[in-house]
């Protein structure tokens, strides 16, 4: 008498439904890699070129923002690799592919103007993360979807706090 098999191996289960290519999710992840790399550079510039009232508070806060951005960069790069993609990894690739544009540092820019620039960068990232959320949802990629959702929630909170510091509503 032959024993009936009631379970299947993970490979057999995975073979039931072929995984989609997730091309759009990979494209948005790579866009995020480029943009997060440039965002880090912009935050670093704000950190270095900041002068005036509030310096002692905002200078270390930029370190916190950079650390958070670096965490998203690493997570999204590694997710892209996990999906079979190849993340941008050179300054040239970041610069050519990022939608964020860098400007020369200027000590004459006020802290308020610097913070407004950070808000502008964070608004762009929040919109990009929303796009990543939508695309990964359409492709059924729940892990990438979660990554974008968590990142967007945190960035939106930073926008709210920065806008409050600037005496403005968050306008999300």
Curated annotation (Swiss-Prot):
Against Pfam families, the record matches this protein to:
Ferritin
| Class of the enzyme per the UniProt entry, highest EC level | oxidoreductase
Q: Which Gene3D superfamilies match?
A: 1.20.1260.10
In the UniProt annotation, what is the result of changing residue 146 to A? No major effects
**EC numbers, comma separated:** 1.16.-.-
- Variant or mutagenesis effect after changing residue 63 to A: Decreases the iron incorporation but is still capable of binding iron to some extent
Q: Which family does it belong to?
A: Belongs to the Dps family.
What is the name listed in the Swiss-Prot or TrEMBL entry for this protein? DNA protection during starvation protein
């Amino acid at each position: 008498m032959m024993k009936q098999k009631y379970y299947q191996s993970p490979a057999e289960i995975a073979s039931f439904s072929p995984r989609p290519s997730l091309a759009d999710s990979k494209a948005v992840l790579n866009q995020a890699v480029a943009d997060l790399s440039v965002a880090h550079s912009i935050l670093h510039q704000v950190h270095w070129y900041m002068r005036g009232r509030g310096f002692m508070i905002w200078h270390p806060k930029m370190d916190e923002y950079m650390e958070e951005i670096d965490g998203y960069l690493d997570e999204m790069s590694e997710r892209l690799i996990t999906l079979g993609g190849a993340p941008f990894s050179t300054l040239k690739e970041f610069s050519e592919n990022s939608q964020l544009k860098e400007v020369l540092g200027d000590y004459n820019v006020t802290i308020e103007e610097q913070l407004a620039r950070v808000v502008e960068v964070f608004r762009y990232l929040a919109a990009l993360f929303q796009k990543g959320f939508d695309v990964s949802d359409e492709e059924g990629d729940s892990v990438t979807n979660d990554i974008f959702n968590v990142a967007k929630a945190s960035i939106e909170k930073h926008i709210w706090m920065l806008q409050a510091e600037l005496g403005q509503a968050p306008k999300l």
